[in-house]
Amino acid sequence: METTPKRSKTLLMSNGEERRSMTFGIEMLPDDLVLSCLARVPRMYYPILSLVSKRFRSFLTSTELYQTRNLLGSTESFLFVCLRIVNDSNPLRLFTLCRRPNSLTKVMVPILSPDSIPKFLPDVVLVGSNIYVIGGLINNNASHKVMVMDCRSHTWREAQGTCVARVSPSACVLDGKIYVAGGCKNLDATMWMEVFDTKTESWEFVSSPGEEICRDLTSCESIGYDGNVYVESMKTYGLYELHKGRWREGQYSMSRGGSLSSQCVIDNVLYRSWSYMVEWYDSENKLWNSLKGLEKLFIVTNQYVPTKCVNYGGKLAVFWLEKVYAKHLHQETKIWCAVITIERRKKEEIWGTREWFDLVFTTNEEMVDLTHVFAATL
């Protein structure tokens, strides 16, 4: 007599019962195995996994998980965007770029920030997996405050404050240290710039370039590049370079035609995005050259285009802002993003290939500034 094969127990389970069985099985694993499993999962699934249990939520925000991801080579680059929305009750807004559910498109998702963060005229930098918000106005007074957001967990803490209270300072990063210049009422040149060691969380003043130069640099922009700190005056557009603790005039060609805040470094080459172009700096010939292959990158071509760019895991991520008007009335503000792969074909020729681009943010607000973009490896 022929017998009917028994169906497996798993097949007889409802979907809910099967999921509970799988979850129970994973929960029985020791910590190191759970960490090893989670470290292999793309971060886009972490919000869903955090709903499994308190234990999972604890793992997903732990430093051990990210150390394991690093050891396994499972790290990913994530983009963060800082906007200033003038008419908003919280003008300093931080976003992360996330993939839409069940889609390949991406969108800027807001990150909650505490009320204690300086919202008016701070500067913002990224070091490792931490975003630092430095100085700014609190109750109409210049602030010493430094707030730090961990990009892995989106949690905030307060760090050691600056030596001098600063409003609208210029900050840049070099070798894991944060150099902060300008933004202080006191014109004492010895206090004009200070540096923050992110490992020891301590501040100290940097040697002064002299009172005359400091007066020129009360409003400035800066960048860390090739072992030096470069500072550009927003009044005279003079460029100065801090090299091995000494100040000297920088190469004017490095900042000519653009601003340091729109530049980034990839493989020790400076790139900048401004108006309708993406360019790279030939440090030997002291010339800016167009990145070939990107003639039609920007959709908007009839007006100045505010842009920012960042090193995105060896690729170039470019953000640009478009304001849409109808009959001279503002309709909406859009932010676009493109990711560009870079290839050096000749010594004096670098090509870019647009990997993807998309509209990532839309708002009805007109007074929107694209202030910073960052890429964190997590």
Swiss-Prot record:
SUPFAM superfamilies: F-box domain, Kelch motif. Gene3D superfamilies: Kelch-type beta propeller. The keyword Membrane does not apply. It comes from Arabidopsis thaliana. This is Putative F-box/kelch-repeat protein At3g43710. Residues 23-69 form the F-box domain. Keywords: Kelch repeat, Repeat. Pfam families: F-box (PF00646), Kelch_FKB95 (PF25210). PROSITE patterns: FBOX (PS50181). The keyword Methyltransferase does not apply.
